[in-house]
C-alpha cells in the first residue's frame, strides 16, 4: 500500500504557473506567477530556501493590496533576508521590495520586464534556482521565456 500511495504522489503534477518546477539546462525555475499575496510570497520563498544552490527571487507586483501595498512589498524583502542570495524586483513596487533587503549589492530593480531582459545576463549565470512570483496581471510568464531565451 505505501508504494501505491507513493506512486500516486509521483504522478501528481502542479497546476500551471503554481509552484511548477521547471528544469532548463542548468537552471531550476519555480514558476509561481499565477497569483501573489503576502502569505503566498512568504511560502514560496520558504520553498526556494530549501534548495542548496544559489537562490534567486524574481518578484513582481502583488495586486489588490490597497493602501498598504508599499508596506506589504517591503515586508517581503525583509522576510527574504538570509533565505535567498539575490532579489530581482520588477514593476511598480520594485523599490519597496528592495527597501529592507540587506544585501544591496544583490538587489536589482527594474521598472519593466523589458528592462530586466536587457540586463539579465549581467545578473544571472544560468545555474541558479529561481523563484518567479507575481500577480497574474504582471504577466511574468514572459520572464520565464526570457530566461529560456538568454540561457
What are these language model-derived features?
Residues 1-151:
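ATP-dependent carboxylate-amine ligase
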Amino acid at each position: 500500500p505505501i508504494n501505491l500511495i507513493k506512486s500516486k504522489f509521483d504522478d501528481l503534477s502542479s497546476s500551471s504557473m503554481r509552484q511548477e518546477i521547471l528544469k532548463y539546462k542548468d537552471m531550476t525555475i519555480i514558476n509561481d506567477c499565477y497569483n501573489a499575496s503576502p502569505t503566498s510570497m512568504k511560502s514560496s520563498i520558504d520553498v526556494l530556501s530549501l534548495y542548496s544552490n544559489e537562490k534567486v527571487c524574481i518578484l513582481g507586483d502583488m495586486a489588490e493590496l490597497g493602501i498598504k501595498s508599499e508596506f506589504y512589498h517591503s515586508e517581503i524583502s525583509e522576510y527574504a533576508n538570509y533565505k535567498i542570495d539575490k532579489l530581482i524586483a520588477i514593476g511598480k513596487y520594485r523599490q519597496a521590495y528592495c527597501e529592507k533587503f540587506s544585501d544591496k549589492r544583490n538587489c536589482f530593480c527594474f521598472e519593466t520586464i523589458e528592462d530586466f531582459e536587457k540586463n539579465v545576463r549581467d545578473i544571472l549565470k544560468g545555474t541558479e534556482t529561481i523563484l518567479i512570483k507575481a500577480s497574474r496581471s504582471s504577466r511574468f510568464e514572459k520572464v520565464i521565456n526570457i530566461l529560456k531565451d538568454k540561457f
